[in-house]
Amino acid sequence: MTIDEIYQMYMNDVYRFLLSMTKDKHLAEDLLQETFMRAYIHIHSYDHSKVKPWLFQVARNAFIDYVRKHKKEVTISDDLIGSLFQNAVQSPAHQVEIKEVLTGYMSELPDNYREALTLYYLKELNYKEASHIMNISEANFKSVLFRARQRLKALYNRGVNDE
């Protein structure tokens, strides 16, 4: 598979992944270019059967490098937060309120928890693909994802009980 074919096939997915992490269209576009530049340079080193996880790993690394360089706090998208609690929400007005509150709680989660939630719920990667991107075992990923859900729910419930 050529870099052009990879770009055409995965550009939108990688862009949405980066946009969900950066919340900035221009930054996501810059990181998308950086991702495919890195992919072009290292195209010989990936497993052709695992293009998507490899590309997401390259994008994740480009994002991490950017954050380290700029020391910028990045939050997760409202779409993911809403999806985590959609079964518990009854009215649209209540759903908007919960999304706003949960957005604040996401900043209190460790980076690996936010990343696990993003990869699994927003990017809809399976355990194996997401664990590969995070460079952890599948069992460890499941554990991180479980703890992330529990922590987010606890933060939400604590806030509800404080009111």
From Swiss-Prot:
Phenotypic effect of disruption: Strains insertionally inactivated in the sigM gene form aberrantly shaped cells that swell and lyse in medium containing high levels of different salts. 70-fold increased sensitivity to the beta-lactam antibiotic cefuroxime (CEF), double sigM-sigX mutants have 130-fold increased sensitivity to CEF. Also sensitive to other antibiotics.
Segments of the chain annotated as binding DNA: 127-146
GO BP term, example: DNA-templated transcription initiation
Induction: Forms an operon with yhdL and yhdK, maximally expressed during early to mid-exponential growth phases. Transcription decreases during late exponential growth; positively autoregulated. Negatively regulated by yhdL and yhdK. Induced by 5% ethanol, 80 uM paraquat, pH 4.3, the antibiotics, inhibitors of cell wall, bacitracin, vancomycin and phosphomycin, heat shock of 10 minutes at 50 degrees Celsius. No induction was observed with pH 9, H(2)O(2), monensin, and the detergents Triton X-100 and Tween 20. Induced 3-fold by the beta-lactam antibiotic cefuroxime.
Keywords (A to Z) from UniProt: DNA-binding, Sigma factor, Transcription, Transcription regulation
InterPro entries in alphabetical order: RNA_pol_sigma-70-like, RNA_pol_sigma-70_dom, RNA_pol_sigma-M_bacilli, RNA_pol_sigma70_ECF_CS, RNA_pol_sigma70_r2, RNA_pol_sigma70_r4_t2, RNA_pol_sigma_r2, RNA_pol_sigma_r3/r4-like
Domain of life where this protein originates: Bacteria
Keyword presence, DNA-binding: yes
Gene Ontology molecular-function annotations: DNA binding; sigma factor activity
Pfam family membership, one: Sigma70_r4_2
Motif segment (Polymerase core binding): 30-43
Job description of the protein: Sigma factors are initiation factors that promote the attachment of RNA polymerase (RNAP) to specific initiation sites and are then released. Extracytoplasmic function (ECF) sigma factors are held in an inactive form by a cognate anti-sigma factor (YhdL) until released. This sigma factor is involved in the maintenance of membrane and cell wall integrity in response to environmental stresses including salt, acid, ethanol and antibiotics stress. Partially regulates transcription from a number of genes including disA. Associates with RNAP core under all growth phases.
Family indicated by similarity: Belongs to the sigma-70 factor family. ECF subfamily.
Assembly and binders: Interacts with the N-terminus of YhdL, which is probably its anti-sigma factor. Interacts transiently with the RNAP core.
Protein name (Swiss-Prot/TrEMBL): ECF RNA polymerase sigma factor SigM
Species: Bacillus subtilis (strain 168)
